[in-house]
Amino acid sequence: KSLEQINRSLHFGQFTPRFSMQYLSSHNQLFYASVSKGYKAGGFNVSFLNNDDYLYSPEYNWNYEIGTKLSFLNNRLSADLSLFYIDWRNQQITNTIPTVGNVIRNAGRSRNKGIEASFQARPTKSWMMYMNYGYTDARFVHYQKEEHGILKDYEGNYLPMVPRHTFSLTTGYSFYDICSWIDRLTLN
């Protein structure tokens, strides 16, 4: 259809609350929990094959996280650990359709759960080392779409573009009091 044949407007609004609790111990060890609602507005697809594809709905999610931030040896060692769970409704998924382009469609429901851990060490005032690891299990709970006239069920499949494992290892060195106009220079 040409753009002149479509005369629609969409209006979206959403309340997105966040609730959190924190406990800071006498040894500067932090423990926390949070619950928050996420939202992404719907919209129009520029390219589409049929009338069902020219609009897509808003997506909603509830995010749950618990974690801790710990420090030891006068802050020379620190560790952060968090567990998370995300319950998604109407997740917006980009589909590439040959000869048409990209079309955004809504998945029925998906969930994402995992763990993130990071460690920092400061052997000297100038030298820092960092290690980060993340594990994510992100899957469709309910998602069906029609491909070439056949209804396909993606329940249990992994979400696209979400790595299961992430890892980084970095180090940095800072030079202090180099001159009067540079307080610190850090190389990573």
Where do the model's predicted regions map?
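Signature of Gram-negative outer-membrane beta-barrel scaffolds
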Residues: 1-26
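Extracytoplasmic loops and strand-loop junctions of Gram-negative outer membrane beta-barrel proteins
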Residues: 2-5, 46-52, 98-103, 149-157
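Outer-membrane beta-barrel proteins
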Residues: 3-11, 54-58, 104-109, 159
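Membrane-spanning beta-strands of outer-membrane beta-barrel proteins
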Residues: 12-15, 61-63, 110-112, 164-166
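Membrane-embedded beta-barrel scaffold of Gram-negative outer-membrane proteins
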Residues: 24, 30-36, 57-113, 122, ...
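Acidic glycine-/aspartate-rich tracts in secreted/extracellular proteins
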Residues: 38-40
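Extended hydrophobic-aromatic, low-complexity segments
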Residues: 43-44, 77-80, 90-92, 179-184
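Gram-negative outer-membrane beta-barrel transporters
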Residues: 85-87, 105-188
